[in-house]
Amino acid sequence: ILDKEGEGDSLSVESLNGKYTINDILVTSNNDKWINISRPTSQACLTVVTNSNSLDEATSYEFKNFIDTDNNDFSPNNYTCMAEDKNGYIWIGTNKGAIYLTNPKLATTENNQSMRCTRVKLINEEGIPYYFLDNTIITTIKVDNGNRKWIGTDGSGVYVLSEDNQEIVHQFNTSNSPLLSDKIYSIEINENTGEVFIGSDKGLVSYKGEATKGKDDYSDVY
């Protein structure tokens, strides 16, 4: 780790010792570090290193399992990506779909082995509730300035979830859009213009989104 003076130091995180694959790191708005261990399957977990004033005071917490709001166990074999939305909720992509944590600070407690999570539940045309992207491999999650979640999948294209998580705003795939492939690797959003860049196994496309970043000064608006 480099400090602002450019001096190097190391941080020993016990829960990361011996882990092979760290494939995502999320620094949250309160400066906690969420670290995703994806492989091997036996080691798949999430580690949170808490915000602290010094490296010596940093504390880490590890957890693997979740209980959803229907009191069902949710234990994926692989954690793939993370994002923080405008409400401070932490979104987590897995091989079984996407979940989010409405109170992520509970992850930094000793009794966190079965964290409470929320799975997005929508209503189909027959009026029957279902879990959004259930058992779908999630590859990337990005949040735009309108708090919509852009969710990339391994084979099903891109889904855009509404700000309140109650409806699918857009669904992009090779059949209904210029998307080059339904196997999505990455999504990035230009906050100033709203443009969304989507990377896949067959190349890059962009979409002109509607949610742009607000200004600090609107004195030129009449």
What are these model-derived regions, one by one?
Residues 32-36, 89-93, 148-152, 194-198:
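Conserved beta-propeller blade signature
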Residues 15, 24-26, 34-37, 42-53:
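Long, internal scaffold/assembly segments composed of regular secondary structure
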Residues 1, 43-47, 63, 98, ...:
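Hydrophobic beta-strand positions in blades of beta-propellers and related beta-sheet-rich domains
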Residues 146-147, 151-155, 160-163:
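Long, C-terminal catalytic modules of enzymes
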Residues 96-99, 104, 183-221:
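Blade-level signature of beta-propeller repeat domains, shared across WD40, Kelch, NHL, RCC1
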Residues 30, 38-41, 46, 95-96, ...:
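Short loop/turn segments immediately following the C-termini of beta-strands
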Residues 7-30, 65-86, 121-146, 174-190, ...:
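Short coil-to-beta transitions that initiate beta-strands within beta-rich domains
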Residues 1, 49-58, 101-117, 162-168, ...:
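Short loop/turn segments immediately following beta-strands, especially the blade-tip
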